[in-house]
């Protein structure tokens, strides 16, 4: 069915390969079994979780046609895994290596009732830019259908200096997000495609802290790029920053109505007690409720105000 997708299965270890490239990291067993997730959610007092796929499995390296078929395959199984579970909701995936096919599949997913999709920062797997003109059809549909687009960094951003000290996760993810989203800010995507809602994990990487510098770049190069300050106001962020002061800074820059509880479950670098950092920030009861679920309930069109997170 998928001639350019390889599966390595040894014991309880699964790895994927695409288009003759190297194998992915091992698939975390907790991504395949929802029972530990359900137990963890109950322990943490989480009512509803928004689930995207695993970026390593998205297959952006495949040809457009095979990539479309692979994305449909992933979506079918993700939707099936969350069907009948009121506390799990799915974000789909699209073949970002081709803007027209990504747009077509996004239309299908929205017709099926999904709130939106999770996409990677590099539309060709280990390279590419989200502001590439060939992706305009995807962004146009995202805006027209008022889709949620969760932008997640890829594994590594091509800098070999990150190969030591486990810095691919600690540093590289944030750099990848910052670079990718800075490009669509400068490209004016939030003005051109105002109907979509973009969500960033890990507190947006370095983006909130570099916003002043990004804006100053426009000041010294007038009339060349869109002002990032304008687009930034339309972005949502999660709370996976691990530090109460960092969270308070994020809220000050983005607004409390743009911040939602996140976890990065089940990955080791995720925040497995996600409410702790929010409570430690000393926010008002109203703001805490917004972060714990009210904002997510509105954004993802959940029936009740509840605790939603990724």
Task: Indicate residue ranges for each PLM-predicted region.
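Helix-coil boundary/capping segments in enzymes
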Residues: 1-310
